Amino acid sequence: MPLGEQHELIRDSVRKFAREQLRPNAARWDRESHFPREELKRLAAMGLCGVAIPEEWGGAGMDHASLAIAIEELASGDGATSTIVQVNNLVAGILLGYGSSAQKQRHLKPIARGELLGAFALTEPHVGSDASAITTRAERAGGGWRLNGVKQFITSGRNADLAIVFAVTDKAEGKKGISAFVVPTNAPGYIVARIEEKAGQHASDTAQIVLENCEIPAENLLGAEGVGYRIALSNLESGRVNVAAQSVGMAQAAFDAAIAYAKERKSFGKPLIEHQAVSFRLADMATGIEAGRQLYLHAAQLRDAGRPCLKEASMAKLFASEMAEKVCSDAIQIHGGYGYVSDFPVERIWRDVRVTQIYEGASDIQRLVIGRALEGA
């Protein structure tokens, strides 16, 4: 399906913002391992903290394709920023779908306005793709809940104002015994135990969170008791589509740098781009980027049309994330030695993009999903 005028407008506006505001600052934020909070306000002013959230709740009222396009363009400016925005929109979407009116008023509107930053706390030290195996417990305590457990690799776990935390409320019920809670990060017992030292995306903090007798009010239960697993899975498709879009954006940034360098740098008396080996490499890079873009847009448009898209979302994420790492590696190769030093952006983009094959379901999980879909075709 062709993109509409709304989609072209958001692509143009976010691309302009990414090139003027994010690209010039990305290397410094990476070195400092810091994302300035004032940037969240700028993003919110463009509607990017609640792209698919209705206007009545402070959002931009756009569709999932618009969100994915925005993520792509943000990632072309800075991968870490796109991750922060992506998770914030994930939290906003969960609050929209499962939050009470009071929870939406208290949390969703401020998130969309850039006043609050959200985190998604599902993964645990020994639990990754199998969400049903979490061990964090939530027990009734007085008039509320007491949480105990450890969450691992939580994006914005330190800098967020609130986290959607998943915990077991009835072990005997298995998946149906998992619930979700809105946990303020200033709640007693919410402890940032460690900030991970990562290969890339340094400006986006990734934390280990310890919940130690963390007490929250009863009204912080999200949805209803026992629907946490359903909440966790409800955003699988959009999460994977957005990571695919993010991968395409970072690949595009690496490609832009590579083609600019290939036109400027001369070798054996002519620009690099005039050497067939280099032009062929660039041709493959451009083809992969466009293929990844079409895959994620197709999946996003299926979701907006209310049609099943689990297989298509997995295809988009699998292809785009692996393509993006290859494109970034090729961009380094085109730069030669300069590609391996921090004076040029491609080494940072290469570090940033590697994780896209891991989070929101590793590549082999995507292959498993696609394979199962084909078995039933």
Question: For each predicted feature, which ranges?
Answer:
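Alpha-helical interface subdomain recognition
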Residues: 1-77, 81-82, 90, 98-103, ...
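Short Ser/Thr-interspersed hydrophobic loop/turn segments at strand-loop and sheet-helix junctions
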Residues: 47, 71-75, 167, 183-188, ...
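Flexible, small-/acidic-enriched active-site or ligand-binding loops
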Residues: 133, 186-217
